Amino acid sequence: MTFLPQEFIRKVRDRAPLDTADVARFVQGVTAGDVTEGQIAAFAMAVYFNELPLSARIALTLAQRDSGDVLDWRGARLNGPVVDKHSTGGVGDLTSLVIGPMVAACGGYVPMISGRGLGHTGGTLDKLEAIPGYDVAPSVDMLRRVVRDAGLAIVGQTAQLAPADKRIYAVRDVTATVESISLITASILSKKLAAGVSALAMDVKVGSGAFMPSAEQSAELARSIVDVGNGAGMRTAATLTDMNQALAPCAGNAIEVRCAIDFLTGAARPARLEAVSFALAAQMLTMGGLAADAHDARRRLRAVLESGAAAERFARMVAALGGPADLVERPERHLPRAAAAAPVAAARAGWIERIDARALGLAVVGLGGGRAKIGDTLDYSVGLSALAELGERVEAGQPLATVHARDADSAAQATDAVRRAYRIGAEPPAQTRVVHAVIE
């Protein structure tokens, strides 16, 4: 029987029972070009309003995985599990840059397929492109070699990995259907499955700087990812973490790379960044069979940080992908620095009771460190550092942050935006946990 995309779309629209084979045929048509952009848009909007049942979410994920190459690591003679983590994105979220090396130093292999920033959230690829010479788009053969030799490679999605997802996402991005939980789930997991990952630790953000607008939707997304990931044969767990302020006390591409290097070398390990990084990395070790339990995993992770083994893995990856061999030893020599720096003075004394993390991310975009639209050229040097945290006591005139900008005018604009993102009150706010819940 001839497969008609419009009939499949009608079933999704009307919430009729879906045959998983039809889901696969639709994705095959997307890959081959037989399904038009209009039909993809209609499908995406139908899913946005109705969502998909679990069986169809799994089928969509597997079909998108199978639309291109699927990496098989069995012939690579790796002596450890292939594991990964993924975040829904936020501000100052540089966990990938520290978790990957930590897990690699513990015996895991991490082929991390990452993305660029859009809107207020920073992208891991943008951070890495602040490193001179770093190749975020190596060939599949090079990806295999770097993962085998360094234990990790943080790179972008290639044209060969989940191409159907790439086409569907391009349509979602211009049709107001990005926020569909079913489509987000399939997009994330199809790329991880195509990379040959056997276990995934998912970081789902909650709060003012989160991708999902409410805590309830964040929890729903986490549950969907766990159920579909496990249903597709990849051991998956999700952690709900706080994004009511920047995760690290910095935001911006080169600035966050420097913060990651400081974390790995022990020069500075901010408590919130450490809490989330250890929680996710410990999940990766336990799911991958590299640690008996969370306590054992944390002990191993602490050991590779203190010994310098994790920093060495990061340096090895950077050099293998074309970056400077001495980046970890001499970051100031290689990372770009902004021409202007300006403190953001507190307007009054009191306690920091609220931070609009999304506004901080948009301030970085305004400086030129993020994209207002796809294709924008970035200034990798700009951003924010020394960000004050929720619950801190500040005096009038005390710096809330430092703005790094290309010139004095853009620094002044960002200074005003950052100051408005902070609300200072007379009483200290209630303390909140950085790790809210774990879903398995």
Swiss-Prot record:
PROSITE patterns for this protein: THYMID_PHOSPHORYLASE
Keyword Cytoplasm: no
Keywords (A to Z) from UniProt: Glycosyltransferase, Transferase
Pathway where it operates: Pyrimidine metabolism; dTMP biosynthesis via salvage pathway; dTMP from thymine: step 1/2
Entry keyword RNA-binding: no
GO cellular component labels: cytosol
Reaction(s) this enzyme catalyzes, per UniProt: thymidine + phosphate = 2-deoxy-alpha-D-ribose 1-phosphate + thymine
Enzyme kind, highest EC tier: transferase
Gene3D superfamilies documented for this protein: Nucleoside phosphorylase/phosphoribosyltransferase catalytic domain, Pyrimidine nucleoside phosphorylase-like, C-terminal domain, Transferase, Pyrimidine Nucleoside Phosphorylase, Chain C
GO biological process: pyrimidine nucleobase metabolic process; thymidine metabolic process
Subunit structure: Homodimer.
Record-linked SMART domains: PYNP_C
Any Pfam family the entry gives: Glycos_trans_3N
Function: The enzymes which catalyze the reversible phosphorolysis of pyrimidine nucleosides are involved in the degradation of these compounds and in their utilization as carbon and energy sources, or in the rescue of pyrimidine bases for nucleotide synthesis.
InterPro entries documented for this protein: Glycosyl_Trfase_fam3, Glycosyl_Trfase_fam3_N_dom, Glycosyl_Trfase_fam3_N_dom_sf, Nuc_phospho_transferase, PYNP-like_C_sf, PYNP_C, Pyrmidine_PPas_bac/euk, Pyrmidine_PPase_CS
GO MF entry, a single one: 1,4-alpha-oligoglucan phosphorylase activity
Family (UniProt): Belongs to the thymidine/pyrimidine-nucleoside phosphorylase family.
Top-rank lineage group of the source organism: Bacteria
Protein EC: 2.4.2.4
Protein name: Thymidine phosphorylase
